[in-house]
Amino acid sequence: QEEVENFSHILNSFGRSENVLQVTKRRYSRLREASVLYYPGPDLGKLSRHRRFFGDHAWSLCGITHTTASSGAMDALVDLVTSPLREWDGLVCPSSAVKGHVLNVIEAQKEYLRREIAATKFT
């Protein structure tokens, strides 16, 4: 609860007045109230699979990737291709270099799936 209050205070210092909800794994459904889940990383695939239990329209997902060089980041980016993400979900790429690399990784994974299992449809 202290983290929520601290975060609310920070938002208020920037002139924002939105309510801040604390969502725990036991209360995942509270994300419907928030309407968007910001995750400070590119791991949106895992989060989109969790969301399926509540419906794809329950909330949107927003992630960010600052680096794409680590194996964890690369795995997360590859996972985006086959995850149940929707057009209202987004991954923030803070530079054109990061965006270019993200798009290259995603396209390489799509090409791999085309070649290996004759995949033809991607979202």
Spans of features found by a protein language model:
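Extended catalytic core of nucleotide-activated donor transferases of GT-like folds
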Residues: 2-84
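A short, active-site helix/loop in glycosyltransferases that binds the activated sugar's phosphate group
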Residues: 73-123
